[in-house]
C-alpha cells in the first residue's frame, strides 16, 4: 500500500521531473510566489505533471480495495459538515424525495434524476482508502452509481473534455465545485455515492451524493453534488483552475495518488 505520508512528495517529484531544470524548485521563495508570471509557469508545470502521471501510471488501474475487516472504526468527516441553505434544509427534511440530480452541459439528453432513480440503476460497491491532503486517511465502504454510466445515458458530446461537479455547500463567496477529465470520469471506480458503510450517506459526509474518484486525493471527492456539467473548458468556471481549493490556494488540479 502507498503510505499517505509519501503521496505529496511523489507528486512533487513528478512535477519537478516534468519541468526539468527550469528553476521551479524555487517555488518556496516569496518573491517568486507573488509573481503572476511565475505562477503562470507553475500552472504550466502542473499540466506537465498531469501528463507525467498519465504516462507513468496505467490509466485504467484500480485503486486498492480492502476487506470489511480492514474498514476504519471512525471515518472523519471534514470540510462542510452541513449546508444551511433553505433549499438544502428542505431536501433533508423530506429525505431528498423531491431532489433531482441535474446532468447537463455538453450532452444531447440532459437528465434530472431522483435519488430513487439513481439507486435503481446498476451500482458499484467498493471498500477504498480516502487519503486527505491534510495527512490522514480512512478506509470506508461506498456504493453508488458509476459516473460513466450517467454520462453515457445523457449522451456526452464528443467535444466534451471535462466534467464539473456543482455542490450545495460554499466557503465564502463561491460555492464548492470540482472537476475531473474524461479518463477519471469513466474510470470504473468513479461513482456518485449514495451509501456509506452500508447506510444511507450521512449529511456530514455529503448527502445526497458524494463523488468518489478513488485515485485522487480527498479534496477532489466533492460532497453535496447537485449538478454534473460536461464542458470543453474549465476556464469559464469561477477562477478557472477547475476546483474550489485549486482556485483559492493553488491546490493541484490533478491530485493523483
Regions found by a protein language model. Name each.
Residues 16, 20, 150-153:
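Generic, well-ordered alpha-helical scaffold segments in large soluble proteins
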Residues 1-8, 12, 19-27:
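N-terminal secretory signal peptides
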Residues 32-257:
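Structured, non-membrane catalytic/scaffold regions adjacent to prosthetic-group chemistry
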Amino acid at each position: 500500500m502507498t503510505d499517505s505520508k509519501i503521496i505529496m512528495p511523489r507528486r512533487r517529484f513528478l512535477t519537478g521531473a516534468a519541468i526539468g531544470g527550469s528553476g521551479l524548485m524555487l517555488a518556496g521563495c516569496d518573491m517568486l510566489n507573488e509573481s503572476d508570471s511565475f505562477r503562470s509557469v507553475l500552472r504550466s508545470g502542473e499540466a506537465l505533471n498531469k501528463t507525467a502521471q498519465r504516462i507513468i501510471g496505467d490509466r485504467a488501474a484500480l485503486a486498492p480495495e480492502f476487506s470489511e475487516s480492514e474498514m476504519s472504526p471512525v471515518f472523519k468527516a471534514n470540510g462542510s459538515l452541513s449546508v444551511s441553505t433553505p433549499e438544502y434544509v428542505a431536501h433533508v427534511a423530506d429525505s431528498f424525495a423531491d431532489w433531482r440530480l441535474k446532468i447537463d452541459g455538453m450532452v444531447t439528453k440532459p437528465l434530472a434524476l431522483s435519488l430513487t432513480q439513481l439507486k435503481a440503476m446498476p451500482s458499484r460497491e467498493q471498500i477504498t482508502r480516502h487519503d486527505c491532503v491534510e495527512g490522514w486517511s480512512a478506509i470506508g465502504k461506498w456504493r453508488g452509481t458509476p459516473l460513466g454510466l450517467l454520462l453515457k445515458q445523457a449522451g456526452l458530446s464528443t467535444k466534451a473534455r471535462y466534467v464539473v461537479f456543482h455542490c450545495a455547500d460554499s466557503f465564502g463567496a463561491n460555492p464548492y465545485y470540482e472537476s475531473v477529465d474524461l479518463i477519471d470520469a469513466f474510470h470504473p471506480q468513479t461513482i456518485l455515492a449514495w451509501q456509506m458503510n452500508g447506510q444511507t450517506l450521512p449529511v456530514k459526509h455529503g448527502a445526497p451524493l458524494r463523488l468518489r474518484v478513488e485515485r485522487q486525493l480527498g479534496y477532489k471527492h466533492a460532497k453535496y453534488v447537485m449538478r454534473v456539467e460536461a464542458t470543453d473548458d474549465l476556464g469559464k468556471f469561477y477562477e478557472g483552475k477547475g476546483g474550489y481549493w485549486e482556485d483559492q490556494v493553488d491546490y493541484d488540479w490533478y491530485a493523483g495518488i
